[in-house]
Amino acid sequence: MEAFTIHTGRAVPLRRSDVDTDQIIPSEWLKRIERTGFGAGLFSEWRADEGFVLNNPAYAEASILIAGPDFGTGSSREHAVWALQDYGFRAVISPRFADIFRGNALGNGLLPVQLPAETVETLQTAAEQDPSVEITVDLAAREVRGAGLVAPFELDDFTRWRLMEGLDDVGLTLRHEELITGFEATRPAWLPSAV
């Protein structure tokens, strides 16, 4: 997993609320288990509309999505996180996230940043008025900067540390590989092996 400390990039204003995981990545894209190749399926039904914000060339290099409230509702679908990442997003800013999506995002290195609705509105407006405006998501300082504001956000210390170290569940486990191997070496051969 790629480490996340501080990221500065352009932002896409997605003025939609209650965006569920089926809208993020429709089910026909879920036939694979690799984590790459899902960018083309991101919001694919909405992208059929020429006026959809991701079709605007001004947002082509955006790496931060600024969404409405209740982003990532619906089924638990890691593919939704993979699609956002494969498209190039490093962070999603919203007034509220579905708990399961938030957990999947944090577990895969996509930073979900929850900010007050008024702050999200300010950031969306800034990105609409000037698509080249840059937003900084600073995980070390736990704040978002841009559009003339500095907005703090909350994230527990352990999750913050994991993201800054680039550690998913497997990476965290592998930090103890020597201990695991040592433990396995002392177990009788007839017992199941963890390595």
Curated annotation (Swiss-Prot):
NCBIfam families per record: leuD, PRK01641.1
Enzyme Commission code(s) on record: 4.2.1.33
Subunit structure and binding partners: Heterodimer of LeuC and LeuD.
Entry keywords, A to Z: Amino-acid biosynthesis, Branched-chain amino acid biosynthesis, Leucine biosynthesis, Lyase
Pathway: Amino-acid biosynthesis; L-leucine biosynthesis; L-leucine from 3-methyl-2-oxobutanoate: step 2/4
Stored Pfam families: Aconitase_C (PF00694)
Source taxonomy: Bacteria, Bacillati, Actinomycetota, Actinomycetes, Frankiales
A single GO molecular function term of this UniProt record: 3-isopropylmalate dehydratase activity
Protein name from the UniProt record: 3-isopropylmalate dehydratase small subunit
Signal peptide stretch: none
Coiled coil: none
One example of a Gene Ontology biological process annotation: L-leucine biosynthetic process
Organism field: Frankia alni (strain DSM 45986 / CECT 9034 / ACN14a)
